[in-house]
Regions:
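Short amphipathic alpha-helical segments that mediate assembly, nucleic-acid/protein binding
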Residues: 86, 259-260
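Glycine-centered helix-coil hinge/cap
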Residues: 24, 261-270
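Alpha-helical protein-protein interaction modules
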Residues: 245, 250, 255-258
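Membrane-penetrating hydrophobic segments
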Residues: 5-30
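Small-residue helix-packing and pore-constriction motifs in hydrophobic alpha-helices
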Residues: 25-77, 88-96, 103-117, 123-156, ...
Length: 270
């Protein structure tokens, strides 16, 4: 699939411009979402039932549950979702292994992303909790990660759900190499603009990065031929953004056919 980055010409050629452009557009999701207006906090049977599930899954008791209840009500008053839906979101987070403090600090980013993107809370919770784990981030980073996803999806031909599917396959490898969530989102956005999306993008990106990180045979020869390296002369890892810029510089001047050949040699085929 990464062979399709014979579109590599257009994709990598414009990577530099788009990288800086997306970077400047990481505007807080929360601004627009809070403006949706205050919706009455729905309590009662649904809310109590949902909070009971949270208690059962998370093991939270006493003052912890009081804090979670209060937070759920707060989310019900400041987002388009009800307090009961906020409680359901907490249940998804608890199932992902988040503890009370994680849920208290992370729920706002998840709910704001769900509201801004139109995705349901279950999908959004899965995307955020899984990706934060892969990139070694904490629950308190959920708001920042939500902003990254919202900005990248609005500036590329993709959406939060498809980006989440890509992250599912690629994030563990990207995170293990120390690549940032920001740079990863930009790479995924660029691939989406080249017509490579969702799980296809995830498996392609995972394969490409794995090939470059542990090159053998054809890949090692191609990296030497085109002067591609994941590390600088001192052995320090380049960031993913620097790697993309390196690919743009080394391959951007090739003909379309040569770029397709380079892509096949460097990234392999899924």
């Amino acid at each position: 699939a990464l062979e399709k980055m014979g579109v590599l010409g257009e994709t990598l050629q414009s990577a530099g411009d788009k990288i800086s452009g997306v970077g400047q557009k990481l505007l807080p999701v929360t601004a627009g979402v809070t403006a949706l207006g205050t919706i009455a906090v729905k309590t009662g049977a649904d809310f109590d039932s949902a909070m009971s599930k949270v208690a059962a899954v998370s093991g939270a008791t006493g003052s912890e549950m009081d804090a979670l209840r209060e937070k759920a009500r707060e989310m019900g008053s400041k987002t388009k979702f009800s307090a009961s839906e906020a409680a359901e979101a907490m249940n998804y987070m608890a199932m992902a292994g988040w503890k009370t403090n994680d849920m208290l600090s992370g729920i706002e980013g998840i709910m704001n992303l769900a509201a801004a993107s139109g995705e349901d809370l279950a999908t959004t919770s899965d995307i955020v909790t899984d990706a934060l784990t892969a990139f070694g981030l904490s629950a308190s980073d959920s708001g920042h990660f939500a902003d990254i996803l919202a900005a990248a999806s609005s500036n590329a031909n993709t959406n939060v759900s498809m980006m989440g599917e890509t992250f599912k396959y690629a994030a563990p490898v990207l995170g293990s190499l120390g690549y940032s969530a920001e740079d990863s989102a930009i790479a995924i956005g660029l691939m989406a603009n080249a017509g490579i999306k969702s799980s296809q993008a995830g498996t392609a990106l995972r394969s490409a990065i794995t090939n470059l990180a542990k090159p053998t045979g054809t890949v090692a020869s191609a990296m030497e031929q085109y002067g591609i390296s994941l590390t600088d002369s001192s052995g320090k890892m380049y960031s993913l953004r620097e790697l993309m810029e390196q690919l743009r510089q080394k391959l951007g001047g090739l003909s379309e056919a040569e770029q397709a050949q380079a892509a096949a040699s460097l990234f392999g085929k899924e």
